[in-house]
Regions:
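Membrane-interface helix-loop junctions at the exits of transmembrane helices
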Residues: 98-99, 197-204, 260-263
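Short, Φ-rich (hydrophobic/aromatic) sequence segments
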Residues: 101-109, 215, 219, 325, ...
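Long, low-complexity, intrinsically disordered segments
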Residues: 422-432
């Protein structure tokens, strides 16, 4: 039995014209999750369509999002060309990241006009912080020039923090790579301006969130050249330089964990505590924690099979950094140090890849690491108490001074990844 009046909702990832036209128009609603295919596929041949933005995959933490695109009101523009477009939506896989993006996106649902993004950002900062200052205005302009610039929609860039360790780290999750699509020094300028108003804005919780978020992004960005220096030192057999740069990288992970522990939004400990609360018995609580851990680490694996899209839902979260990501990097650097001490080499050339990065058990190191990762998902009672600890502004100021000094050593030339980003395969549809 079936309802003859039902409406099928179909995602547009792999639609084919023959499949679509086999269904009466009144019984089909197409969801163009990223708003890209409607133009390519002739407006889906007149079928009712909802366009939108798929801004986040897996709950990953990365500052990004094309605010210019949102402000241009893409729904109204597309509807003029394809009248069958009947709605606009957001199809993110998780929230609690990039609040400025969602604030504007939800506002645009209620508007038929375009928005002056510069004016809107000034008003947004005033609403968010409870005051408007020259510093916050300038900081917002810099963020628009940086992570929220044009062509930053869709798949977020990878995290060196959450990436499985390698000499040549290609990506963290199975999607986009590590390229930073803006000058990372922009964030230092923005954070300096935000921190300058700390005394005035310290009572604003959103201000405290933003100060932490920008500092987090500064640290994950600079982590890339720090690790690159460590890898270069290993290949040059320079033990002193290797110890310096690998030590700085591991310390950066500890610093980031301390910073993010100030906010519940960035807490793996909160995630695990809430997961356990769903269980009634100890066995149920343990299972909930194991499932919640698996989701953010190996993603999932059937008995006897290795994970295929491990680290799909990576998060730069306190607790997860300290207990999982840092341990992976410690194991990797210890392995490299052993090779240096013994005068032997280590190469990743020719290793089997999975979605553009080394597969789960690509060599002896990854076999051992994979065993540890799977064992980690089975551990219980990992949550630390208290869940939050420390003052956001105090810690952000201290870390800003530290990493601003380090930036001179690691950003000696202007960083540009534009060409790499344009040509890389991001696997937005993991069935590809």
């Amino acid at each position: 039995q079936f309802d003859k009046g039902c409406i099928w909702a179909m995602q547009s990832w792999s639609l084919r014209e023959d499949i679509v036209k086999a269904v009466p128009r009144e019984n089909l609603l197409i969801l163009d999750l990223a708003g890209k295919r409607v133009r390519r596929d002739q407006g889906f041949w007149g079928y009712p369509t909802v366009i939108g933005n798929l801004h986040n995959f897996g709950g990953r933490i990365n500052m990004h999002g094309d605010l210019h695109l949102l402000a241009a009101n893409q729904y109204q523009d597309i509807k003029k060309v394809y009248p069958n477009v009947c709605g606009d939506g957001l199809f993110m896989e998780a929230v609690e990241q990039n609040p400025v993006y969602y604030d504007l996106a939800f506002e645009m649902f209620h508007r038929t006009d375009k928005v002056n993004i510069h004016t809107w950002l000034q008003q947004y900062a005033q609403r968010r912080y409870g005051a408007r200052t020259v510093n916050t205005d300038q900081a917002m302009r810099l963020l628009l020039e940086g992570p929220y610039r044009r062509n930053t929609n869709g798949t977020e860039r990878s995290s060196i923090v959450a990436a499985r360790p390698a000499l040549n780290v290609k990506k963290s999750g199975p999607n986009a790579g590590l390229g930073i699509p803006y000058d990372p020094l922009i964030l230092f300028k923005a954070e300096r301006l935000l921190l300058a108003d700390a005394e005035l804005l310290k009572h604003s919780k959103p201000y405290r969130f933003d100060v932490v978020d920008v500092m987090r992004q500064i640290m994950t960005n600079i982590g890339q050249p720090i690790h690159k220096k460590a890898a270069e030192a290993f290949e040059a057999k320079d033990k002193t330089a290797f110890a310096l740069h690998s030590g700085r990288f591991l310390q950066m992970l500890e610093d980031m964990d301390e910073l993010l522990r100030t906010r519940p939004e960035y807490s793996f400990d909160r995630w695990l505590t809430e997961a356990r609360s769903w269980g009634e018995t100890k066995a149920e609580k343990d299972l909930m924690e194991q499932d919640a851990t698996t989701l953010l680490t190996v993603w999932g694996a059937q008995e006897g099979n290795d994970p295929g899209i491990f680290d799909y839902a990576w998060r730069e979260w306190s607790g997860l950094i300290n207990g999982f990501y840092k341990v992976r990097w410690q194991k990797f650097y210890s392995m490299l140090q052993k090779h240096l001490d013994e005068g032997t080499g280590y190469s990743e050339e020719g290793l089997k890849l999975s979605h553009g990065r080394e597969s789960f058990r690509a060599n002896d190191f990854y076999i051992s690491l994979g065993d540890w990762e799977l064992d980690y998902t089975r551990q219980v009672n990992k949550a630390r108490t208290p869940i939050t600890q420390g003052d956001e502004i105090e810690i952000a100021k201290r870390l800003f001074r530290k990493y601003e000094k380090l930036s001179a050593a690691y950003y000696q030339t202007k960083v540009s990844n534009a060409d790499i980003i344009k040509t890389e395969k991001t696997y937005e549809n993991l069935g590809e």
